[in-house]
Amino acid sequence: MPYPKKVTIKEVGPRDGLQNEPVWIATEDKITWINQLSRTGLSYIEITSFVHPKWIPALRDAIDVAKGIDREKGVTYAALVPNQRGLENALEGGINEACVFMSASETHNRKNINKSTSESLHILKQVNNDAQKANLTTRAYLSTVFGCPYEKDVPIEQVIRLSEALFEFGISELSLGDTIGAANPAQVETVLEALLARFPANQIALHFHDTRGTALANMVTALQMGITVFDGSAGGLGGCPYAPGSSGNAATEDIVYMLEQMDIKTNVKLEKLLSAAKWIEEKMGKPLPSRNLQVFKSS
């Protein structure tokens, strides 16, 4: 299959990038950074999480951030929503899309959110129904699709079963997560073959971690199979919680650079994106793993 002519990058740095970081980023700095990202040409930014502050203290200012940002025309501002209370707060903050989440691995789901996958499905169905009543779309994250830190391999049958249940709820898109950064192109092909036999490619997104340096190679395989939506985090912000010190989220600017070199449109202005990544790197007080950011700083 030929490469697509256009790809959508969904920026998750302000949520997924910051949520596990020990450094507190002030509310006004979060707002400034999101506003910078809004002016890069990105059409989608996941700005925060409405998970209880007890679990994600780094994003305890979620409502203030959501209310404080500038809203650029044509940009969807999304947030992670764990339950109906979180959805109520997200609606108060003026969020455009609710992002729900669960694991394909039973063990990881229990350790991560203290629920069975069946219990999670029940909650997410309620959240999705309430979001639709409020005229919000719902995006679902399914993590540990390509490997679990506890169970190792996750059966493809389990991934298919949970994906079918989520789509039956009426979610608009399913983002498949490589939580431990263990995926390889052959595995990506196998998983996508199974899912694309059941679901349309335009409702599947991929969220790769670059822990072992395979994120971009995995994306090329997905592109060849018709996937046109990928998650990225500016600067590569957000480490892998199961491999301390290792790279986590794929850097948005590395994805954009690769796609541009392949003549695939993203509508993202790379230099503005790099400036935003450099800005948050300075606020974090540590080097971020993005390759293109390092080149940008040295030029």
From Swiss-Prot:
The active site is at residue 240. Pfam families: HMGL-like. GO terms for biological process: ketone body biosynthetic process; L-leucine catabolic process. The keyword Lyase applies. Residues 7-274 form the Pyruvate carboxyltransferase domain. InterPro entries: Aldolase_TIM, HMGL, PYR_CT. Pathway: Metabolic intermediate metabolism; (S)-3-hydroxy-3-methylglutaryl-CoA degradation; acetoacetate from (S)-3-hydroxy-3-methylglutaryl-CoA: step 1/1. Substrate binds at residue 15. It catalyses: (3S)-3-hydroxy-3-methylglutaryl-CoA = acetoacetate + acetyl-CoA. Its EC number is 4.1.3.4. A divalent metal cation binds at residues 16, 207, 209, 249. Keywords: Lyase, Metal-binding. Belongs to the HMG-CoA lyase family. Homodimer and homotetramer. This is Hydroxymethylglutaryl-CoA lyase YngG. It comes from Bacillus subtilis (strain 168). The gene is yngG.
